[in-house]
């Protein structure tokens, strides 16, 4: 076995040890370990299961804490074990043992990289599920088809991540695509991953709806906001709400309810409107719409605070949800994020949900 390769492995383990120490401090390892012990104790209380919602929250918190604490524990023990295995492999000239060490160290590096990525999730709601509102801009069929393409892109991204998606509201376009839609994305750090997708998305392409095959520009807006659990208090005055019911519509007229089960809620002080029609029960749709409203009010408050903070920092641009964030030029095979400068040429892969590069660039640059 070459001494250079052995030294390289030992250097990798030393580097992992240093990075592990840094991330333990940054992520408050001891605090999270203590809290995990508390949460495990709570989960073992039989009384907890009398409150299914609370039990679900405890289970979710436990999973997030375990993802940090147990990973750091595994990295620490892995570093120590592999140092001993390297010594044994050298003494016994064990090529197979040495190959196993290289594979295991590569796995430790992957775990560390995943943890370091999670360091970028610095907002309280980052671990939460989220909602995505997609709305077609002006331009009729072109814009509605583009909104439908974005709807598919985010659905495919969620599937790639192993997330669960639920369509809460969908208003089909007259010819193609959608006029607007709201989807719920359920999964660990769904909001943290998707929050930087908020903004206006611009499409440039030769239109399939134009017999002259002219180049068209279309716009659609995306708004991502977190699902709020009971740990974050949002007070809503019932007097501030206007609640309307209407008949739910389905794609192509399918499964249309004959009762007014769909619910639209308007929060009059802010003008925020939410609607839900995915359930046949008006009561269930109203409950879902209220959860969406709480989440939107939370996101509005967070954005107000961020804007106030940015106003104090010279040179910071407005990153309100109305800002154009990304350009998709299909005939040139180019998709570029206007905030980070990140650019790719494989437009098909991106529209099929391969958003990791864009999301990572946005989080790294603190967008």
UniProtKB/Swiss-Prot annotation:
Disulfide bonds: none
Keywords: Cytoplasm, Methylation, Protein biosynthesis
A GO molecular function held by the record: translation release factor activity, codon specific
UniProt xrefs under HAMAP family: Rel_fac_2
Cited InterPro entries: PCRF, Pep_chain_release_fac_I, Pep_chain_release_fac_I_sf, PrfB
Post-translational modifications reported in the UniProt record: Methylated by PrmC. Methylation increases the termination efficiency of RF2.
Record protein name field: Peptide chain release factor 2
Organism: Neisseria gonorrhoeae (strain ATCC 700825 / FA 1090)
Family statement: Belongs to the prokaryotic/mitochondrial release factor family.
Designated gene of the protein: prfB
GO CC entries: cytoplasm
Residues with the N5-methylglutamine modification: 254
Function according to Swiss-Prot or TrEMBL: Peptide chain release factor 2 directs the termination of translation in response to the peptide chain termination codons UGA and UAA.
SMART domains: PCRF
